[in-house]
Amino acid sequence: MMNEHTVKRQGAHPKALPYLFLTEMWERFGYYLMLGIFSLYMLDSQQNGGMGFSPEEKSDIYGTYLGLVYLTPFLGGLLADRLLGYRTSIFIGGLLMAAGYFGLSMKGETTFYVSLLLIILGNGFFKPNISTLLGNLYNKEEYRGNKDSGYNIFYMGINIGAFASNFIAAYFRINYGWSWAFAAAGFGMLLGLMVFYAATKHIREADVIKPMEEGDMSTGRILLFTLVPMFAFGILGYLIPGNLLGTDSNDAFIFGCIPVVTFF
Protein backbone atom coordinates (compact mmCIF):
# COMPACT_ATOMS: atom_id res chain seq x y z
CA MET A 1 0.00 0.00 0.00
CA MET A 2 2.82 2.41 0.87
CA ASN A 3 4.63 1.74 -2.40
CA GLU A 4 1.42 2.17 -4.42
CA HIS A 5 0.64 5.43 -2.58
CA THR A 6 4.17 6.71 -3.16
CA VAL A 7 4.02 5.95 -6.88
CA LYS A 8 0.68 7.69 -7.15
CA ARG A 9 2.05 10.81 -5.43
CA GLN A 10 5.11 10.89 -7.69
CA GLY A 11 2.89 10.76 -10.76
CA ALA A 12 0.37 13.26 -9.40
CA HIS A 13 0.66 15.68 -12.31
CA PRO A 14 1.40 15.28 -16.02
CA LYS A 15 4.94 16.01 -17.16
CA ALA A 16 3.58 18.74 -19.42
CA LEU A 17 2.25 20.85 -16.52
CA PRO A 18 5.47 22.87 -15.93
CA TYR A 19 5.73 23.57 -19.66
CA LEU A 20 2.13 24.74 -19.92
CA PHE A 21 2.59 26.77 -16.74
CA LEU A 22 5.54 28.64 -18.26
CA THR A 23 3.85 28.99 -21.64
CA GLU A 24 0.78 30.57 -20.08
CA MET A 25 2.93 32.73 -17.82
CA TRP A 26 4.80 34.24 -20.77
CA GLU A 27 1.65 34.64 -22.84
CA ARG A 28 -0.11 36.51 -20.04
CA PHE A 29 3.07 38.52 -19.46
CA GLY A 30 2.83 39.83 -23.01
CA TYR A 31 -0.93 40.29 -22.92
CA TYR A 32 -1.04 42.28 -19.68
CA LEU A 33 2.08 44.24 -20.53
CA MET A 34 0.40 45.45 -23.70
CA LEU A 35 -2.94 46.05 -21.99
CA GLY A 36 -1.34 47.95 -19.13
CA ILE A 37 0.22 50.60 -21.38
CA PHE A 38 -2.36 50.51 -24.18
CA SER A 39 -4.48 53.46 -23.04
CA LEU A 40 -1.46 55.57 -22.13
CA TYR A 41 0.12 54.86 -25.51
CA MET A 42 -3.00 55.92 -27.39
CA LEU A 43 -3.30 59.16 -25.41
CA ASP A 44 0.37 60.12 -25.53
CA SER A 45 1.32 62.68 -28.16
CA GLN A 46 2.97 61.66 -31.40
CA GLN A 47 5.98 63.77 -30.45
CA ASN A 48 6.50 61.42 -27.50
CA GLY A 49 6.02 58.33 -29.65
CA GLY A 50 2.34 57.75 -28.87
CA MET A 51 -0.70 57.75 -31.13
CA GLY A 52 -2.10 61.13 -30.11
CA PHE A 53 -5.73 59.99 -29.97
CA SER A 54 -8.41 61.95 -28.16
CA PRO A 55 -9.95 60.43 -24.99
CA GLU A 56 -13.11 59.63 -26.98
CA GLU A 57 -11.17 57.83 -29.72
CA LYS A 58 -9.14 55.98 -27.11
CA SER A 59 -12.27 54.78 -25.32
CA ASP A 60 -13.88 53.55 -28.55
CA ILE A 61 -10.77 51.63 -29.61
CA TYR A 62 -10.13 50.20 -26.14
CA GLY A 63 -13.72 49.02 -25.70
CA THR A 64 -13.89 47.49 -29.18
CA TYR A 65 -10.57 45.74 -28.65
CA LEU A 66 -11.62 44.19 -25.34
CA GLY A 67 -14.99 43.13 -26.74
CA LEU A 68 -13.38 41.30 -29.66
CA VAL A 69 -10.67 39.79 -27.45
CA TYR A 70 -13.39 38.08 -25.40
CA LEU A 71 -15.36 37.04 -28.49
CA THR A 72 -12.67 35.30 -30.53
CA PRO A 73 -11.87 32.49 -28.01
CA PHE A 74 -15.24 30.97 -28.88
CA LEU A 75 -14.32 30.87 -32.55
CA GLY A 76 -10.76 29.71 -31.90
CA GLY A 77 -11.94 26.94 -29.63
CA LEU A 78 -14.45 25.76 -32.20
CA LEU A 79 -11.86 25.62 -34.98
CA ALA A 80 -9.42 23.79 -32.72
CA ASP A 81 -12.05 21.21 -31.73
CA ARG A 82 -13.24 20.52 -35.25
CA LEU A 83 -10.40 21.30 -37.64
CA LEU A 84 -6.96 22.29 -36.38
CA GLY A 85 -6.27 20.58 -33.07
CA TYR A 86 -5.11 22.31 -29.91
CA ARG A 87 -1.35 22.29 -30.44
CA THR A 88 -1.54 23.83 -33.91
CA SER A 89 -4.05 26.42 -32.73
CA ILE A 90 -1.81 27.43 -29.83
CA PHE A 91 1.16 27.89 -32.14
CA ILE A 92 -0.93 29.93 -34.58
CA GLY A 93 -2.30 32.08 -31.78
CA GLY A 94 1.09 32.67 -30.20
CA LEU A 95 2.71 33.68 -33.48
CA LEU A 96 -0.15 36.04 -34.32
CA MET A 97 0.04 37.71 -30.93
CA ALA A 98 3.82 38.05 -31.11
CA ALA A 99 3.48 39.63 -34.56
CA GLY A 100 0.85 42.00 -33.17
CA TYR A 101 3.04 43.09 -30.26
CA PHE A 102 6.01 43.69 -32.53
CA GLY A 103 3.70 45.56 -34.90
CA LEU A 104 2.68 47.93 -32.11
CA SER A 105 6.34 48.76 -31.63
CA MET A 106 6.35 50.25 -35.13
CA LYS A 107 4.94 53.61 -36.16
CA GLY A 108 1.88 54.23 -38.30
CA GLU A 109 -1.88 54.18 -37.82
CA THR A 110 -2.43 51.36 -40.32
CA THR A 111 0.19 49.23 -38.59
CA PHE A 112 -1.50 50.01 -35.28
CA TYR A 113 -4.90 48.67 -36.36
CA VAL A 114 -3.46 45.64 -38.16
CA SER A 115 -1.47 44.79 -35.03
CA LEU A 116 -4.58 44.95 -32.86
CA LEU A 117 -6.35 42.61 -35.28
CA LEU A 118 -3.47 40.13 -35.07
CA ILE A 119 -3.57 40.18 -31.27
CA ILE A 120 -7.35 39.71 -31.24
CA LEU A 121 -7.17 36.73 -33.59
CA GLY A 122 -4.15 35.28 -31.82
CA ASN A 123 -5.84 35.45 -28.44
CA GLY A 124 -8.81 33.59 -29.90
CA PHE A 125 -6.62 30.72 -31.04
CA PHE A 126 -4.42 30.61 -27.95
CA LYS A 127 -6.44 31.33 -24.83
CA PRO A 128 -9.16 28.64 -24.84
CA ASN A 129 -7.01 25.86 -26.23
CA ILE A 130 -4.11 25.77 -23.80
CA SER A 131 -6.60 25.39 -20.93
CA THR A 132 -8.45 22.64 -22.80
CA LEU A 133 -5.18 20.87 -23.56
CA LEU A 134 -4.32 20.86 -19.86
CA GLY A 135 -7.74 19.44 -19.04
CA ASN A 136 -7.24 16.64 -21.55
CA LEU A 137 -3.98 15.69 -19.87
CA TYR A 138 -5.83 15.20 -16.58
CA ASN A 139 -8.36 12.83 -18.13
CA LYS A 140 -6.01 9.95 -17.36
CA GLU A 141 -7.08 8.01 -14.28
CA GLU A 142 -3.73 8.52 -12.54
CA TYR A 143 -4.05 12.32 -12.76
CA ARG A 144 -7.80 12.85 -12.53
CA GLY A 145 -7.91 13.35 -8.77
CA ASN A 146 -5.36 16.15 -8.97
CA LYS A 147 -7.05 18.16 -11.71
CA ASP A 148 -8.11 21.03 -9.44
CA SER A 149 -4.66 21.47 -7.97
CA GLY A 150 -3.18 21.27 -11.45
CA TYR A 151 -5.34 24.14 -12.63
CA ASN A 152 -4.43 26.12 -9.51
CA ILE A 153 -0.76 25.74 -10.40
CA PHE A 154 -1.50 26.63 -14.02
CA TYR A 155 -3.42 29.78 -13.11
CA MET A 156 -0.63 30.86 -10.79
CA GLY A 157 1.39 31.32 -13.96
CA ILE A 158 -1.17 33.90 -15.09
CA ASN A 159 -0.72 35.86 -11.87
CA ILE A 160 3.07 35.75 -12.03
CA GLY A 161 3.16 36.85 -15.66
CA ALA A 162 0.69 39.67 -15.08
CA PHE A 163 2.56 40.85 -11.98
CA ALA A 164 5.98 40.88 -13.64
CA SER A 165 4.70 42.63 -16.76
CA ASN A 166 3.98 45.85 -14.84
CA PHE A 167 7.60 46.34 -13.85
CA ILE A 168 9.01 45.39 -17.24
CA ALA A 169 6.57 47.69 -19.04
CA ALA A 170 7.45 50.62 -16.79
CA TYR A 171 11.19 50.02 -17.10
CA PHE A 172 11.24 49.84 -20.90
CA ARG A 173 8.78 52.71 -21.34
CA ILE A 174 10.73 55.06 -19.08
CA ASN A 175 14.20 54.14 -20.33
CA TYR A 176 13.67 53.23 -23.98
CA GLY A 177 10.21 54.36 -25.08
CA TRP A 178 6.94 52.79 -26.18
CA SER A 179 8.42 50.70 -28.98
CA TRP A 180 10.69 48.70 -26.71
CA ALA A 181 7.92 48.16 -24.19
CA PHE A 182 5.69 46.56 -26.84
CA ALA A 183 8.64 44.61 -28.24
CA ALA A 184 9.22 43.15 -24.76
CA ALA A 185 5.69 41.72 -24.92
CA GLY A 186 6.52 40.14 -28.28
CA PHE A 187 9.72 38.57 -26.99
CA GLY A 188 7.81 37.22 -23.99
CA MET A 189 5.30 35.53 -26.27
CA LEU A 190 8.09 33.98 -28.35
CA LEU A 191 9.71 32.62 -25.19
CA GLY A 192 6.39 31.05 -24.28
CA LEU A 193 6.17 29.36 -27.67
CA MET A 194 9.69 28.00 -27.31
CA VAL A 195 8.73 26.43 -23.99
CA PHE A 196 5.55 25.04 -25.53
CA TYR A 197 7.51 23.50 -28.40
CA ALA A 198 9.73 21.74 -25.87
CA ALA A 199 6.59 20.11 -24.42
CA THR A 200 5.54 18.52 -27.71
CA LYS A 201 6.31 14.93 -26.73
CA HIS A 202 4.37 15.31 -23.47
CA ILE A 203 1.17 16.74 -24.97
CA ARG A 204 0.83 14.81 -28.22
CA GLU A 205 -1.65 12.29 -26.82
CA ALA A 206 -3.88 15.06 -25.42
CA ASP A 207 -4.04 16.91 -28.74
CA VAL A 208 -7.21 15.36 -30.16
CA ILE A 209 -9.63 16.60 -32.79
CA LYS A 210 -13.22 15.81 -31.87
CA PRO A 211 -15.16 14.35 -34.81
CA MET A 212 -18.65 15.60 -35.49
CA GLU A 213 -21.38 13.36 -34.13
CA GLU A 214 -24.90 12.87 -35.36
CA GLY A 215 -27.01 15.86 -34.46
CA ASP A 216 -24.05 18.26 -34.17
CA MET A 217 -24.38 21.57 -35.95
CA SER A 218 -21.84 22.06 -38.72
CA THR A 219 -18.94 24.45 -38.20
CA GLY A 220 -20.20 26.70 -40.98
CA ARG A 221 -23.66 27.04 -39.44
CA ILE A 222 -22.22 27.81 -36.01
CA LEU A 223 -20.03 30.54 -37.48
CA LEU A 224 -23.01 31.90 -39.41
CA PHE A 225 -25.22 32.10 -36.33
CA THR A 226 -22.49 33.82 -34.30
CA LEU A 227 -20.82 36.17 -36.77
CA VAL A 228 -23.96 37.55 -38.44
CA PRO A 229 -25.58 38.69 -35.16
CA MET A 230 -22.24 40.07 -34.01
CA PHE A 231 -21.89 42.28 -37.07
CA ALA A 232 -25.57 43.21 -36.98
CA PHE A 233 -25.42 44.41 -33.39
CA GLY A 234 -22.09 46.10 -34.05
CA ILE A 235 -23.60 48.13 -36.88
CA LEU A 236 -26.67 48.87 -34.75
CA GLY A 237 -24.46 50.08 -31.93
CA TYR A 238 -22.59 52.33 -34.34
CA LEU A 239 -25.83 53.88 -35.61
CA ILE A 240 -27.61 54.30 -32.27
CA PRO A 241 -25.50 57.20 -30.87
CA GLY A 242 -26.88 59.47 -33.57
CA ASN A 243 -30.53 59.14 -32.58
CA LEU A 244 -32.92 59.09 -29.62
CA LEU A 245 -31.63 55.75 -28.33
CA GLY A 246 -28.15 57.16 -27.93
CA THR A 247 -28.71 58.49 -24.42
CA ASP A 248 -28.25 56.32 -21.35
CA SER A 249 -31.62 57.26 -19.86
CA ASN A 250 -33.68 56.41 -22.94
CA ASP A 251 -32.21 53.02 -23.80
CA ALA A 252 -32.12 52.01 -20.12
CA PHE A 253 -35.80 52.85 -19.80
CA ILE A 254 -36.87 51.13 -23.03
CA PHE A 255 -34.80 47.96 -22.68
CA GLY A 256 -34.68 47.72 -18.89
CA CYS A 257 -37.61 49.32 -17.10
CA ILE A 258 -40.44 48.64 -19.56
CA PRO A 259 -39.95 44.81 -19.61
CA VAL A 260 -39.79 44.75 -15.80
CA VAL A 261 -42.99 46.80 -15.45
CA THR A 262 -44.74 44.72 -18.13
CA PHE A 263 -43.99 41.26 -16.78
CA PHE A 264 -43.60 41.83 -13.04
What is the predicted function of each stretch?
Residues 1-19, 141, 170-264:
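Intracellular loop-helix junctions on the cytosolic face of multi-pass helical membrane proteins
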Residues 34-59, 245-246:
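Short amphipathic helix-loop junctions that connect adjacent transmembrane helices
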Residues 42-43, 79-81, 103, 168-177:
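Interfacial helix-cap and linker-helix signal at transmembrane-aqueous boundaries
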Residues 59-81, 127:
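Central cavity-lining transmembrane alpha-helices of secondary-active solute carriers
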Residues 89-90, 151:
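Primarily marks hydrophobic transmembrane alpha-helices of the MFS/SLC 12-helix fold
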Residues 92-113:
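C-terminal ends and interior cores of transmembrane alpha-helices
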Residues 100, 111-126:
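Hydrophobic core of transmembrane alpha-helices in multi-pass small-molecule transporters
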Residues 125-141:
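Intracellular juxtamembrane helix-capping segments at the cytosolic ends
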